[in-house]
UniProtKB/Swiss-Prot annotation:
Role noted for this protein: Binds to 23S rRNA. Forms part of two intersubunit bridges in the 70S ribosome.
Protein name from the UniProt record: Large ribosomal subunit protein uL14
SMART domains reported for this sequence: Ribosomal_L14 (SM01374)
GO cellular component terms, semicolon-separated: cytosolic large ribosomal subunit
Keywords: Ribonucleoprotein, Ribosomal protein, RNA-binding, rRNA-binding
Pfam family, one: Ribosomal_L14
Entry's Gene Ontology molecular function annotations: large ribosomal subunit rRNA binding; structural constituent of ribosome
Amino acid sequence: MIQQESRLKVADNTGAKEILCIRVLGGSSRRYAGIGDVIVATVKDAIPGGNVKRGDVVKAVVVRTVKERRRADGSYIKFDENAAVIIKNDNDPRGTRIFGPVGRELREKKFMKIVSLAPEVL
């Protein structure tokens, strides 16, 4: 469960290391974001020479959450960290690599490029 002021690890090679959620997209009173939801965030920590720099406002899709999520078959999925992938306005990733596993919910929400780049889909 990601909300405003939540900090997330960045799971791609755009150069950002950590982002801070400033808005959950999808309605004026929407409070939480889960796996597959889009957020607006600001870059809090970045490596020199990367595609994004500290202070940039970016859109990102959540790929891992610590809070467990119930699936339709009754199983639950949760991860060790909160992580996101920075995306462009057309929902394609800005980076060329994805690090770590991503949730199957991304396939259902039509983030196919992220699913194809990910090393593992859980």
